[in-house]
């Protein structure tokens, strides 16, 4: 139970007319520390109790059980509560030390599945910073819900089907080399794709040839299928190398192609339920009653199924396979109309579990204020970006700590962590401008800043040769340590807020605040000096490092012990 919950519970005993949650929401932090740590305004009770707020405040202050607090006093219409800092710090430090990385674990999820549709790069196209957002936001949310007791299922819905494969097959048969593709799959396939598109602009017969090869692929032609499978496999080898660098793994790589034989069932159900209407030769589902102006296009006039039909098949398959409590689609903001249609069609089909599906949208990454585009060449590729970030991290580590062992591994943790943290500290609906210098800086609100605070604490603990005892009671009541204690106590609430809002930036901002509070404490306090508080100060360091490391882990960022 955190401080606000404790206060609300005590006030609710005296004033049963108010719900505990309402009391919690009314609690304020006084502007002046002399007025207590938290204050409860009695105005809202005046109508209910038919008394002046000043009298109500005096009554509550007199009747409340103050044994958990330093003191409780009424000042005008406010009940001012002074917390027992020594007691609270002992409780919080005791919990963190006893539970370690499991501090703030919960069982809200009760082992139920949450399916994450995430990352989803296109086969034979390079993995760009644009794909990074979906990957790291979803991975962090998956870690956060796992801490709440859910079981995340990470699904990489690969872009592994479509007419572009007809183009690729034509290009490969004209100019391709097995050796070149194996040596550098994505780059080689991209070059072939760009070259064939340029030729198609000059020669319309190329388009027809590509369409013919895609028709063969759809019909299961042996040569077309073998080439498609090979392009997919080679691309996946390269993607997996990048995912390994990012420290991200998946439970399923079922992409678009996986649902080829599952779309007929969707069309059959829609037909059976009388939901399909004809519109200019195409088959559509009208969604006006959901306030959606444009109908969902299920089948084109030539009988070809569409993107939404595939997503409907995927939703049905995932519900049957994983029986998810929630399905989270971490996909760019520009897809919001598509997901509204998807949920509405499922609702029309009678699947009320569509209410458990959420589109977690995010803003764009820009470069120098301009939108990124593979076609226009304004693209930031992930692989060279990681390499550059690691090099810059290594240069800073060399300058700060030239004799550090495992420099390469630490530079990798810092470089990759810097890119991920910068993305995750941004409110997901906001985009950000890509700036590698800002990302890899050890100053400011960055991943390396938080990692360095953790490494600094580990250095202090090594110097002191300190391991906390489970039997000891550690408590502090100075101003600087209190700022840290309040943050540590708030960690369980932070996790719930991040999960409820699908917002990893809440955890990233918490990690920054905790690192800043510790650095302030470090500047004001002689931690290692012999004094009666020495062990309690070291216990505070230990607890701070534990929670910093866990917050970073939730974001998919490593916390090196040395930097």
Swiss-Prot record:
MF terms in GO: arginine-tRNA ligase activity; ATP binding
Biological process (GO), any one: arginyl-tRNA aminoacylation
Motif residue range(s): 'HIGH' region: 121-131
Annotated SMART domains: Arg_tRNA_synt_N, DALR_1
Keywords for the protein's UniProt record, in alphabetical order: Aminoacyl-tRNA synthetase, ATP-binding, Cytoplasm, Ligase, Nucleotide-binding, Protein biosynthesis
Catalytic activity, as annotated: tRNA(Arg) + L-arginine + ATP = L-arginyl-tRNA(Arg) + AMP + diphosphate
Pfam families: Arg_tRNA_synt_N, DALR_1, tRNA-synt_1d
Catalytic activity, EC: 6.1.1.19
One term under GO cellular component: cytoplasm
Domain of life: Bacteria
Gene3D superfamilies linked: Arginyl tRNA synthetase N-terminal domain (3.30.1360.70), HUPs (3.40.50.620), Isoleucyl-tRNA Synthetase, Domain 1 (1.10.730.10)
Cellular compartments annotated: Cytoplasm
Assembly, per entry: Monomer.
Family: Belongs to the class-I aminoacyl-tRNA synthetase family.
Protein name listed in UniProt: Arginine--tRNA ligase
Organism: Streptococcus thermophilus (strain ATCC BAA-491 / LMD-9)
Gene: argS
């Amino acid at each position: 139970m955190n401080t606000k919950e404790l206060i609300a519970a005590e006030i609710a005993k005296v004033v049963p007319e108010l719900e505990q949650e309402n009391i919690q929401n009314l609690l304020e932090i006084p502007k002046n520390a002399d007025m207590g740590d938290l204050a409860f305004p009695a105005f809202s009770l005046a109508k209910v109790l038919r008394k002046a707020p000043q009298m109500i405040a005096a009554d509550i202050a007199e009747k409340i059980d103050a044994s958990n607090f330093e003191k409780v006093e009424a000042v005008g219409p406010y009940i001012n509560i002074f917390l027992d800092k020594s007691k609270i710090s002992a409780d919080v430090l005791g919990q963190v030390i006893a539970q370690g990385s499991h501090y703030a674990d919960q069982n809200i999820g009760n082992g139920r599945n949450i399916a994450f549709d995430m990352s989803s790069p296109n086969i034979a196209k390079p993995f760009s910073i644009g794909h990074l957002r979906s990957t790291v936001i979803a991975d962090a949310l998956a870690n956060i819900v796992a801490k709440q007791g859910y079981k995340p299922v990470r699904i990489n819905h690969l872009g592994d089907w479509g007419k572009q494969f007809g183009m690729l097959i034509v290009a490969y048969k004209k100019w391709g080399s097995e050796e070149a593709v194996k040596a550098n799959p994505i780059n080689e396939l991209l070059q072939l794709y760009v070259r064939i598109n340029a030729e198609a602009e000059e020669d319309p017969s190329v388009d027809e040839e590509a369409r013919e090869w895609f028709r063969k692929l759809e019909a299961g032609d042996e040569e077309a299928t073998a080439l498609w499978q090979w392009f997919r496999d080679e691309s996946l080898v390269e993607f997996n190398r990048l995912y390994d660098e990012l420290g991200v793994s998946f439970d399923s790589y079922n992409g678009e192609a996986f649902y080829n034989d599952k779309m007929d069932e969707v069309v059959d159900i829609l037909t059976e339920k009388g939901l399909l209407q004809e519109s200019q030769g195409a088959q559509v589902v009208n969604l006006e009653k959901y306030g959606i102006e444009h109908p969902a296009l299920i089948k084109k006039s030539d009988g070809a199924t569409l993107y939404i039909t595939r997503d409907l098949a995927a939703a049905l398959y995932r519900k049957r396979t994983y029986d998810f409590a929630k399905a989270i689609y971490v996909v760019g903001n520009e897809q919001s109309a598509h997901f509204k249609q998807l949920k509405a069609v499922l609702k029309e089909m009678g699947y009320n579990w569509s209410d458990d599906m959420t589109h977690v949208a995010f803003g764009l990454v820009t470069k120098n204020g301009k939108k990124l585009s593979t076609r226009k060449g304004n693209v930031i590729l992930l692989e060279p970006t990681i390499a550059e970030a690691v090099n810059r991290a290594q240069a800073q580590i060399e300058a700060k700590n030239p004799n550090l062992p495992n420099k390469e591994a630490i530079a990798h943790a810092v470089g990759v962590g810097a890119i991920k943290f910068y993305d995750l500290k941004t409110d997901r609906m906001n985009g950000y401008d890509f700036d590698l210098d800002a990302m890899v800086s050890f100053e400011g609100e960055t991943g390396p800043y938080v990692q360095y605070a953790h490494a600094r604490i580990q250095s202090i603990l090594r110097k002191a040769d300190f391991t906390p005892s489970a039997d000891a009671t550690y408590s502090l009541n100075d101003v600087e340590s209190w700022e840290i204690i309040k943050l540590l106590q708030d960690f369980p609430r932070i996790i719930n807020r991040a999960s409820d809002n699908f917002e990893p930036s809440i955890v990233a901002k918490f990690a920054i605040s905790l690192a800043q509070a510790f650095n302030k404490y470090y500047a004001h306090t002689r931690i290692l000096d012999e004094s009666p508080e020495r062990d309690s100060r070291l216990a505070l360091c230990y607890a701070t490092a534990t929670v910093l490391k866990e917050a970073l882990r939730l974001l998919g960022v490593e916390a090196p012990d040395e930097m």
